[in-house]
Amino acid sequence: MVTKAHLDKVKSYVDLGLKEGAKLKVDGRGFRLQGYESGFFMGGCLFDEVTPDMRIYKEEIFGPVLSVVRAKTYEEALRLPSEHDYGNGVAIFTRDGDTARDFATRVNVGMVGVNFAIPVPLSYYTFGGWKRSGFGDLNQHGPDAVRFYTKTKTVTSRWPSGIKEGAEFVIPTMK
């Protein structure tokens, strides 16, 4: 992490997840990087049995904490991220191409990983956070970055027959 305050905040989410009843399968809170013991490092943490009523599900943690939310049906798996307040990203792991295409098309999030985690933070992937997960009015990479520096113009033309000279400055109406 960049600061001790952020490290402490992420660790507090892990503590909160345990208090709320999630099962911590991998605990990286004790990670130390040799030679950098005073740094703000934390190993990965993996929660299982996370439910939508838990804060670790409801809030974006911005740290190495992954939550597994189990869905009973495909439609529930599609609905959970689509109805979440944040629309940053989701991953689906499947061997069924039709299911992957359907999920990627229907899910209401900005980034979808199929058979691998969400493709960030590599700069050549577009950041597509949606809903409360977006930052600003444009995405930071990809077409929106180009649009930010582009001046666009819309021209609407109409060339009716019968006007020989002069100009008309009225909206045509049906007679």
PLM regions and their residue ranges:
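Short beta-strand segments
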Residues: 25-28, 92
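Short, solvent-exposed loop/turn elements at beta->coil junctions and helix N-caps
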Residues: 28-35, 117
